[in-house]
Amino acid sequence: MDYTLTRIDPNGENDRYPLQTQETVSGDPLEQHVHRSVYMGKLENAMHDMVNWGRKNSLWPYNFGLSCCYVEMVTSFTAVHDVARFGAEVLRASPRQADFMVVAGTCFTKMAPVIQRLYEQMLEPKWVISMGACANSGGMYDIYSVVQGVDKFLPVDVYIPGCPPRPEAYMQALLLLQESIGKERRPLSWVVGDQGVYRANMQPERERKHAERIAVTNLRTPDEI
């Protein structure tokens, strides 16, 4: 599995995204520790698994929305969908108490600096979900006043397609984010281990389901969809 490595440099000059240089590395980053010491490698792996388990099962979203996609996001908090099953029901009014931000809706150029400032105020570790076609690529607003994708100024972890996406799509994005967090390798301390953040490169759902869709021979009628 390939990982994206982001080096941590607290003395870096840049104060905007991307804060650090990124590179793609192959293989599990813990393999080097396993070959050096089997006991310490297993112990460090268990520590990472335990910390990641706590992080992925207590994701607190930042109460922030831009447009109509935000309505679909908050719909998942109702009793019908019950997003509390995934531990992501605690909305935070302050970015300093939130774990991830959902950019739901159209991002205008005047709003981009505000979003970036809110992202910078979030504490590490933090993640970003881009929800809807407008947040992903500008949507139907191919115009000077709309940012053509929030990944122009924010590091996006999960993209949710749709205009607008259904609440089920948002909950699936939470599951994908939890899966990604479970494979992350972050420094356990500022003095222990490699000072770099390893994120597993996620396979797009389109590619993952491609073979399954090609194998379908009996298509459902429009009434059955």
From Swiss-Prot:
Sorted alphabetically, which SUPFAM superfamilies does this protein's record hold? Answer: HydA/Nqo6-like
Chief subcellular location: membrane
Q: Where in the cell is it found?
A: Cell inner membrane
- UniProt cofactor note: Binds 1 [4Fe-4S] cluster.
Q: Which reaction does it catalyse?
A: a quinone + NADH + 5 H(+)(in) = a quinol + NAD(+) + 4 H(+)(out)
For the keyword Metal-binding, the answer is: yes
Q: How does it sit in the membrane?
A: Peripheral membrane protein
Supply the alphabetized keyword list: 4Fe-4S, Cell inner membrane, Cell membrane, Iron, Iron-sulfur, Membrane, Metal-binding, NAD, Quinone, Translocase, Transport, Ubiquinone
What EC number(s) does this enzyme carry?
Answer: 7.1.1.-
Q: Per its Swiss-Prot or TrEMBL entry, what cofactor is needed?
A: [4Fe-4S] cluster
Recorded GO cellular component terms are:
plasma membrane; respiratory chain complex I
* Protein's GO biological process: aerobic respiration; electron transport coupled proton transport
Residues where [4Fe-4S] cluster binds: C68, C69, C134, C163
Q: Give a GO molecular function annotation for the protein.
A: iron ion binding
Q: Which family does it belong to?
A: Belongs to the complex I 20 kDa subunit family.
Q: What is the purpose of this protein?
A: NDH-1 shuttles electrons from NADH, via FMN and iron-sulfur (Fe-S) centers, to quinones in the respiratory chain. The immediate electron acceptor for the enzyme in this species is believed to be ubiquinone. Couples the redox reaction to proton translocation (for every two electrons transferred, four hydrogen ions are translocated across the cytoplasmic membrane), and thus conserves the redox energy in a proton gradient.
Sorted alphabetically, which NCBIfam families does this protein's record hold? nuoB_fam, PRK06411.1
Q: How does it assemble?
A: NDH-1 is composed of 13 different subunits. Subunits NuoB, CD, E, F, and G constitute the peripheral sector of the complex.
What HAMAP family does the database record attribute to this sequence? Answer: NDH1_NuoB
Specify the protein name: NADH-quinone oxidoreductase subunit B
What organism is this sequence from?
Yersinia pestis
Its organism's taxonomic lineage begins at: Bacteria, Pseudomonadati, Pseudomonadota, Gammaproteobacteria, Enterobacterales
Q: Which gene encodes it?
A: nuoB
